[in-house]
Amino acid sequence: MAERRWTARLLAFIGIIATLTSCDNVPWQEEKLKHGATTLSSSELSSVISHTDLDRMWQKDLKTMLVVRYPGSTGSQHVREHIKSTLGSMNAGWEVTEDAFYSHTPYGQLPFTNIIATLNPAAKRQLVLACHFDSKYYPPQWDGREFLGATDSAVPCSMILELARAQDDELKTLKDSGSDLSLQLFFFDGEEALYQWTSEDSLYGSRHLAHKMATTPHPPEATNTSQLDSIDLFVLLDLIGGPNPRFGNQFSSTTRWLSKLQKIERRLHALGHLENHPNEVQYFWPGLHVGLILDDHIPFLNQGVRILHLITSPFPAVWHTFDDNEENLDRTSIGNLNKILQVFVLEYLNKKSQNPIAEST
């Protein structure tokens, strides 16, 4: 009897160990579900935000982006070249590729080109930051007025480029470490409808890339996982740059990451790092539930990718008007959001600052 009891206890113990082992040894594509981000110290926060420069972003990126850039236009090509050359010049060593294709539109076959920048293509998992670089097409009948799409989405694209530039050293160190978690940037072409929004006349670039990734094995030798499985979290930035931005919650599956942004906002406010920011929370509202918004995340959402949609609610007052220009941008909120986003990315990637600023005593 005693021997049986001992055997039963041994088997139970082995079962517990096996269960714990199996819980830790989850498939790589499920690691995103239990991913935990780091929290930077106050000195590390100060170091991270000291690298970003709003004036630099404004001159180098935003002014370059503020041109008519509908698909196939000269402005579109100019902006694409700027994105590629900017990322290609950085020390982190981004792999920059194009996803070029033709698609039928209300104006016939038109060329589209997405840009994909990957910090470490060998990494199994990717945090994705995404935006669209095209501007809405208006026929030439508006007395010479041009739609520049400052919030929609020149500012979001500029913010992503500034993040890569400001955190170049940190991202290079992350890449050199061989981490299995990396950063990927998507710049979509053809988000806007060319005539009237339908499922066919919209989201040209994101629909094409989502399908391409769904049919491309990842890792390359895989038989049952695709590049879509590599996406830990898909963070889409849109309609950013107006005054008093608020970001609500569309997806319960990523509430904790919207809450993470709110916590970063609170901490930076408490440390005095946010300008003209009277309340500790102004931007990120995980308790504010908003309805589904059609945007470049939809083709990825439909494939099961987890989405964090950073789009202002309500939309900016200048949305889809000729007043969506540089003159009506709010520099202060853009600068504050730059800081919050850059901290969020480094914390998600579990990347400590290279040279933390010493805390005062």
Predicted features and spans:
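A non-catalytic alpha/beta surface segment that caps or lines the substrate-entry region
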Residues: 25-29, 34, 40-41, 50-122
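Solvent-exposed loop/turn segments at secondary-structure junctions
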Residues: 102-105, 121-123, 133-137, 190-194, ...
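Structural recognition of the beta-strand scaffold that forms the well-ordered cores
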Residues: 116-118, 126-130, 184-187, 232-238, ...
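Extracytoplasmic/secreted proteins, especially bacterial periplasmic and envelope-associated proteins
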Residues: 57-64, 74, 78-91, 155, ...
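Active-site-adjacent substrate-binding region
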Residues: 36, 71, 233, 239-361
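Cleavable N-terminal signal peptides of Sec/SRP-targeted secreted and luminal proteins
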Residues: 5-25
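Second-shell loop/turn segments in exported
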Residues: 44-52, 64-77, 101-106, 142-154, ...
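Acidic/histidine-rich catalytic neighborhood of metal-dependent amide-processing enzymes
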Residues: 145-260
